[in-house]
């Protein structure tokens, strides 16, 4: 949860580039550790940051 919360905090502080780096690092760490739930949450947060969360368009 640390990478997720750090990324969200950076987003709230208006630092999306840094948030993206944190999410991507967290994704790598979570996948290597086999933490698929954490990786999924980080991927969703990254997609939202990048405007790739299509569910909101409906």
What are these language model-derived features?
Residues 56-58:
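Alpha-helical repeat scaffolds
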């Amino acid at each position: 949860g640390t990478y997720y919360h750090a990324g969200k905090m950076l987003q709230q502080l208006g630092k999306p580039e840094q948030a993206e780096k944190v999410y991507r690092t967290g994704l790598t760490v979570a996948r290597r550790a086999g933490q698929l739930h954490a990786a999924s949450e980080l991927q969703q947060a990254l997609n939202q940051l990048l405007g790739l969360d299509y569910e909101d368009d409906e």
